[in-house]
């Protein structure tokens, strides 16, 4: 399985840390056994996406992530808490900034090493991004915040720039803009690494 592939990677050969994306406690246990030093858990800013992507509510996903966070701290593993549909959800519509702010505060307080805002369906615009990230940087500082943008509406790079203006310096990206979301029809891949690097 994926855990065997991860365990066989020569991680020292990578310029950046390898990160295991885990869906639940079983995923955490497999990642830990495979030698993962950093894991990413997905949280949700809407119940619609939580149900479609993980067959659970937002509250259930939060509780599982908090439990994994406690274990990871004991195990010396870093945790990235990624908040999906931080700007809009294909099932529930626009996401209230207050929902995202509460989620970020909860996981910052719980000790997440990073909290990432994910524009899962690529619906955000620079004005939204600038407003939300500026507020969050003011509340928590920029050091543990990051962003994850999809380029569905060709706004990904503009959204990166808006977040940079707020002080964010950590971004997810993918080679040649690969990626997508199986539960977000029409959503394209992530912002391309080569575009961000330029």
Which stretches of residues belong to each language-model region?
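Short acidic/histidine-rich active-site segments
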Residues: 171-176
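Conserved hydrophobic beta-strand within the GNAT/NAT acetyltransferase core sheet
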Residues: 20, 147-149
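Core AdoMet radical
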Residues: 16-23, 51-59
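C-terminal helical cap(s) of enzyme catalytic domains, especially alpha/beta-barrels
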Residues: 181-198
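Alpha/beta enzyme core
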Residues: 8, 25-52, 61-78, 86-147, ...
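N-terminal capping/small domains of soluble enzymes
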Residues: 1-26
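Short gly/pro/ser/thr-enriched loop/turn and capping motifs at secondary-structure boundaries
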Residues: 46-49, 177-182
């Amino acid at each position: 399985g994926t855990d065997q592939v991860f365990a066989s990677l020569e991680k020292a050969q990578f310029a950046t840390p390898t990160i295991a994306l885990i869906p639940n406690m079983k995923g955490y246990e497999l990642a830990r056994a495979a030698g993962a030093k950093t894991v990413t858990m997905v949280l949700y800013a809407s119940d619609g996406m939580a149900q479609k992507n993980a067959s659970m509510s937002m509250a259930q996903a939060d509780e599982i992530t908090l439990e994994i966070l406690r274990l990871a701290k004991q195990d010396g593993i870093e945790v990235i808490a990624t908040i999906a549909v931080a700007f809009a959800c294909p099932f529930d519509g626009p996401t209230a900034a207050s929902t995202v702010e509460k989620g970020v505060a909860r996981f910052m307080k719980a000790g997440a090493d990073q909290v990432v805002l994910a524009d899962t369906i690529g619906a955000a615009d620079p004005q939204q991004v600038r407003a939300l990230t500026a507020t969050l940087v003011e509340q928590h500082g920029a050091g543990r915040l990051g962003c994850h943008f999809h380029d569905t509406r060709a706004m990904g790079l503009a959204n990166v720039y808006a977040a940079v203006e707020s002080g964010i310096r950590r971004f997810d990206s993918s080679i040649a803009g690969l990626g997508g979301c199986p539960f977000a029809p029409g959503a394209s891949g992530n912002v391309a690494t080569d575009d961000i690097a330029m």
